[in-house]
Amino acid sequence: MSDYILEIKDLHASVNDVPILKGVNLSIKPGEIHAIMGPNGSGKSTLSKVIAGHPAYSLLNGDILFYGRSILKMEPDERARAGIFLAFQYPVEIPGVSNADFLRIALNARRKFRELPELSPLEFFQLITEKINLVGMKESFLSRNVNEGFSGGEKKRNEILQMALLESNLSILDETDSGLDIDALKIIAQGINTLATSTNSIVLITHYQRLLDYIIPNFVHIMSDGKIVKTGNVNLAQDLEKHGYDWIKST
């Protein structure tokens, strides 16, 4: 098995025939937290969706390896069952589907892939009760429809709850800090830090350095015009906060 959870090699991708990713290279080992920053239109969110297998994006060149195996031919649901989790910038509402049913079905699909027995409703309730406390949610959220009527912070916490429950190997969090006040941000960050282990990896996609005040990444990558143009530690994010993205172009 590969030493890397994720390897992205010379990745080029487009949407509606417009090139967005123009040669992305990235390697992530177990236990690492990577932050990807960049201005609007730099390709950050596109990269996350291409990894997850979003059908709107066309792969032009390159490869994506998950534990050393290409996932390009895997459907999005196969990638999710294999252990790739994507938290959306704007989580969708699913009317008519309760949080509890959605989470139990998703968890059992993941367990089936891992050749583990499905959980009964009682076993699931015992597990979800443990996980729900992690993100400061009330049990009443389980009976509500998925994200329907949720505030922005509640939607983001619901995604972290999914991440906790599914125990994904690679979690990609696309602008999880977007629209959160400082109290909600701290709760989300605490949950993410608790879920970071020596065997999984987390990718944080963000515009702002403030998230990295609470979650310290091993690596910070700056994207510009569809490529990773600079890599460093958390100090790079702090420099970016001081000088802006034009500073990257001049270095």
From Swiss-Prot:
Database matches in Pfam families: ABC_tran
ABC transporter domain segment(s): 6-250
Molecular-function GO terms, alphabetical: ATP binding; ATP hydrolysis activity
Cell compartment(s), UniProt: Plastid, Chloroplast
Highest rank taxon of the organism: Eukaryota
Keywords attached to this entry: ATP-binding, Chloroplast, Nucleotide-binding, Plastid, Transport
PANTHER family xref list: ABC TRANSPORTER I FAMILY MEMBER 6, CHLOROPLASTIC
Protein name: Probable ATP-dependent transporter ycf16
Protein's organism: Porphyra purpurea (Red seaweed)
